[in-house]
């Protein structure tokens, strides 16, 4: 089944943001007898975060992180991680009786540099899909809202709401996939050993596209006779992957244009603002952009999209605890506020400040104003949280007092019964 002209890859990474069709593509590729594609291993994300644990860890999250980083800093962490990953992938392949594993994990856009350093020679398959269609799928499948009266486009309140959990982390991450993940993956198109697959062409001509990708991996495309959606039981047994594939009988293109009726004009406007008209055109979706314009949306310019990216990047850096002046491993908002007060400056992320310095239209004063407003809103959120905690503590004390009173009453009744 396999060619002998070049060594076959142990691991291939399938990249694409959530709801772009990665589950379908992985399923079709693993119909080749030498290829397996487990549902979303997330292994690279776990390895990249090695040493960072939940702040509730009883041993102390900051102690674990500092100690692990200190120890790993004395060795070649990348080579050690590579050995672990090779062992994990190899054991999975051996158990499956396959030769190449396709790691399909949509949020690998978050660790692309780590991915490249760990597996610089690994082939990549980059799946691109119309951002409007992705948004429609996020809306219909996960209920992700794209219109919010509480959070006007690119307003400072957006950042404060993101950090304080409104919208929920799941919704914010889904939006970050579009705002940060899509442009990050778009930059991978020219990378060596990268095959680009377009979702629209995949569902129009599945056999042709799968055979092309299989050949690009070094395998004989004749190994796949028909690209169908049978044998999806492995998805039913997993917590990950697109569950809709379980209901499919065949590959079809019905989902390519449904966004035109599923998204409102306001939602199309939001998607255009989040992604940017320039990126839509760059990725080849100018016809979709024109349809949205004909429907009534306007191109608000690069500044709006860049502002969204800065807001989400700042939120993302705060989540990771990597913002400037934020202690390593800090997971509590208290740590953020204390550092901000000590410095009497803005703890905006280094990556965001760097980006602002590179973009003349965004001045440092605007960044400081954005950060100052964010800190003020977060302080108010903290005060509200502390008030809520005080109320809950008072309720607990009242509950404990009531329990103690009941215990005394039980003792009194027991004593009266024994007399």
UniProtKB/Swiss-Prot annotation:
<dbReference type="Pfam" id="PF13469">
    <property type="entry name" value="Sulfotransfer_3"/>
</dbReference>
<protein>
    <recommendedName>
        <fullName>Nodulation protein NoeE</fullName>
        <ecNumber>2.8.2.-</ecNumber>
    </recommendedName>
</protein>
<comment type="function">
    <text>Required for the formation of sulfated nod factor. Proposed to transfer activated sulfate (PAPS) to the fucose of the nod factor.</text>
</comment>
<keyword id="KW-0614">Plasmid</keyword>
<keyword id="KW-0808">Transferase</keyword>
<keyword id="KW-0536">Nodulation</keyword>
<dbReference type="GO" id="GO:0008476">
    <property type="term" value="F:protein-tyrosine sulfotransferase activity"/>
</dbReference>
<dbReference type="InterPro" id="IPR027417">
    <property type="entry name" value="P-loop_NTPase"/>
</dbReference>
<dbReference type="InterPro" id="IPR026634">
    <property type="entry name" value="TPST-like"/>
</dbReference>
């Amino acid at each position: 089944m396999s060619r002998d002209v070049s060594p076959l890859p142990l691991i291939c990474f399938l990249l694409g943001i959530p709801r772009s069709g990665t589950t379908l593509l992985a399923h079709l590729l693993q119909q080749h007898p030498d290829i397996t594609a487990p549902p979303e291993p997330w292994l690279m994300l776990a390895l990249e975060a090695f040493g960072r644990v939940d702040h509730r860890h009883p041993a102390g999250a900051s102690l674990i992180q500092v100690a692990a980083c200190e120890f790993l800093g004395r060795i070649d962490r990348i080579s050690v991680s590579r050995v672990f990953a090779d062992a994990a992938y190899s054991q999975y392949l051996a158990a499956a009786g396959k030769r190449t594993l396709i790691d399909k994990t949509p949020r690998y856009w978050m660790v692309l540099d780590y991915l490249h350093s760990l597996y610089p020679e690994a082939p990549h398959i980059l799946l691109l899909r119309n951002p409007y269609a992705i948004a429609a799928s996020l809306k219909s499948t996960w209920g992700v809202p794209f219109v919010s009266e509480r959070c006007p486009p690119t307003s400072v309140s957006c950042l404060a709401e993101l950090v304080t959990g409104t919208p929920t982390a799941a919704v914010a991450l889904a939006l970050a996939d579009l705002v940060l993940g899509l442009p990050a993956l778009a930059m991978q198109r020219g990378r060596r050993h990268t095959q680009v697959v377009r979702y629209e062409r995949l569902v129009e001509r599945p056999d042709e596209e799968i055979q092309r990708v299989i050949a690009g991996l070094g395998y004989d495309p004749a190994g796949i006779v028909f690209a169908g959606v049978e044998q999806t039981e492995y998805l039913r047994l997993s917590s990950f992957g697109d569950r809709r594939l379980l209901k499919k009988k065949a590959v079809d293109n019905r989902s390519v244009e449904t966004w035109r009726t599923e998204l409102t004009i306001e939602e199309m406007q939001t998607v255009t603002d989040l992604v940017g008209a320039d990126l839509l055109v760059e990725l080849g979706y100018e016809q979709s952009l024109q349809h949205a314009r004909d429907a009534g949306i306007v191109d608000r310019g690069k500044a709006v999209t860049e502002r969204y990216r800065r807001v989400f990047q700042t939120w993302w850096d705060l989540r990771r605890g990597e913002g400037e002046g934020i202690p390593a491993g800090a997971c509590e908002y208290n740590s953020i506020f204390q550092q901000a007060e000590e410095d009497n400056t803005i703890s905006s992320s280094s990556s965001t400040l760097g980006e602002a310095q590179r973009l003349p239209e965004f001045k440092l004063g605007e960044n400081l104003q954005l950060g100052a407003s964010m800190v003020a809103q977060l302080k108010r959120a903290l005060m509200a949280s502390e008030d809520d905690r005080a109320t809950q503590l008072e309720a607990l004390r009242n509950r404990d007092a009531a329990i103690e009173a009941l215990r005394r009453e039980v003792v009194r009744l027991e004593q009266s019964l024994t007399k």
